[in-house]
């Protein structure tokens, strides 16, 4: 029964793949929980510093930092955060589609675009399409630190300081829940004003030793913290997407095994029926 042996070989192969995807699902679930903890730990800082910066942008400062001034958007920079590994569904490609659509709108209005890419998937994608990539970094692992990102962020900040770009955005996947990851584009520069436009009065802070030196450091740290938060959120999204993808692959493998087992049983039944028929026919001929 050559057909039966071939089917059994396929079943064994699919079972082997199912074991791999099941193990990857469990690993991704464990890493996702760890990534969620890191994301939850850093999110309050990122949120609060964003609120502080928003109020500073609305304040009446004697010293106007260049990051607060609106410019005509002739050149736009994107810091794109992706994963280093695949097998995470459409996480990366959905993000790339969103940033390319936004970049196309900017280019349609006459602006130039350039990219700083984080993660090997974004590095490969934007280099292969011939985009202008000003900085790139990959291999950050599952627990990156802020210092890992400082160099790449500094390249884009220097470009902004030199007037080489007029807008700076960070693009990442925002973690909503295990089943939902939302591609997000946040403006970093010029500083976005506070979302609370309905506040009845404006206030300013007291700066020690002076506004100039403090804001120079604070605003750079703000940009770095927002990019870091995007990286941390993206890691949580990556693990959640991988867990869901591997669960789907495991379930599909189970369905395929059931289908192959049914085909095998039918083939075996047909072979037995044929053998019985041959035996009966042979006995009748002898008799």
UniProtKB/Swiss-Prot annotation:
Domain of life: Bacteria
GO cellular component: plasma membrane; proton-transporting ATP synthase complex
PROSITE patterns: ATPASE_GAMMA (PS00153)
InterPro entries, per database record: ATP_synth_F1_ATPase_gsu, ATP_synth_F1_gsu, ATP_synth_F1_gsu_CS
Example of a GO biological process term: proton motive force-driven plasma membrane ATP synthesis
Subunit structure: F-type ATPases have 2 components, CF(1) - the catalytic core - and CF(0) - the membrane proton channel. CF(1) has five subunits: alpha(3), beta(3), gamma(1), delta(1), epsilon(1). CF(0) has three main subunits: a, b and c.
Protein name: ATP synthase gamma chain
Lineage: Bacteria, Pseudomonadati, Pseudomonadota, Gammaproteobacteria, Alteromonadales
């Amino acid at each position: 029964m050559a057909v039966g042996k071939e089917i059994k070989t396929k079943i064994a192969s699919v079972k082997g793949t199912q074991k791999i995807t099941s193990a990857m699902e469990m690993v991704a679930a464990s890493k996702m929980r760890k990534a969620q903890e890191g994301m939850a730990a850093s999110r309050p800082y990122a949120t609060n510093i964003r609120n502080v910066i928003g109020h500073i942008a609305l304040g009446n400062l004697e010293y106007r930092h260049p990051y607060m001034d609106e410019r005509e958007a002739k050149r736009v920079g994107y810091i794109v955060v992706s994963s280093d590994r695949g097998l995470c569904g459409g996480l990366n490609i959905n993000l790339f589609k969103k940033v390319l659509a936004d970049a196309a709108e900017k280019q349609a209005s006459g602006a130039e675009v350039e990219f700083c890419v984080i993660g090997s998937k974004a590095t490969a994608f934007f280099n292969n399409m011939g985009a202008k990539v000003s900085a790139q970094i990959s291999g950050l692992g599952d627990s990156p630190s802020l210092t890992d990102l400082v160099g790449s962020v500094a390249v884009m900040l220097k470009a902004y300081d030199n007037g080489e770009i007029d807008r700076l955005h960070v693009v990442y996947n925002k973690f909503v829940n295990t089943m939902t990851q939302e591609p997000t584009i946040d403006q970093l520069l010029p500083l976005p004003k506070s979302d609370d436009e309905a506040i009845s009065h404006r206030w300013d802070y007291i700066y020690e030793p002076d506004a100039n030196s403090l804001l120079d450091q604070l605003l750079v740290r703000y940009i770095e913290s927002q990019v870091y938060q995007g990286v941390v959120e993206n890691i949580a999204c990556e693990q959640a997407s991988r867990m869901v993808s591997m669960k789907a692959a495991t379930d599909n493998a189970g369905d395929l095994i059931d289908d192959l087992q049914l085909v095998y049983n039918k083939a075996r039944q047909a072979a037995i029926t044929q053998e019985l028929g041959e035996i009966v026919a042979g006995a009748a001929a002898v008799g």
